[in-house]
Amino acid sequence: MPQTFPVEEIKDWIFDLDNTIYPARSNLFVRVAVRITEFVATHFDVPQDEARVIQKDLFQRYGTTMRGLMVEEGLEPSDYLHFVHDIDVSDLPREAELEAMLAKLPGRKHIFTNGTVPHAENILNAYGIRHHFEHIFDIVGADYVPKPEAHAFAKFIEKTGIDPH
């Protein structure tokens, strides 16, 4: 029988951003993926279909396309991150149910994302839920090492002071 833990005793809640804190139906991750493909196509001067093949290969081998471009191409990540996260979020609706659910959770709430802090804030502000999160930990704070790598989690724990036990 699974062990239960009283919700009121949970001190820290950790949320991923993409397709987790916001609904997949928003297509935000798809919007970012389109921008990633555009970046790869421009970087390698190849058509979109070829760029998608390169993108998928880098993602599978390195955990993120960006990490693959950094290792194989010497990419400076800031331009990449700015480009791929430059998406329109003006059509996102306020999510009253999500707002209510977050308001009920005791303890600190954190976002842990392979995106950037500005990208996360852009989305959280659009949904009207930014005020619920004490901390946003991003790929920059993880030294550009993506989740699920152990280094990213160690940096997250170090930065937030969360006791993982």
Model-derived features with residue positions:
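Substrate-recognition "cap/lid" segment bordering the active-site pocket of phosphatases
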Residues: 110, 116-165
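Small/polar loops that bind or transfer phosphate-bearing groups
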Residues: 24, 111-112
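N-terminal helical cap/lid subdomain that shapes the substrate entry/recognition surface
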Residues: 3-15, 20-97, 118
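Short glycine/proline-enriched coil/turn segments at helix->beta-strand junctions
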Residues: 71-74, 105-109, 161-163
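A general structural motif
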Residues: 7-10, 106, 164-165
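Catalytic-core regions built around general acid/base machinery
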Residues: 97-106
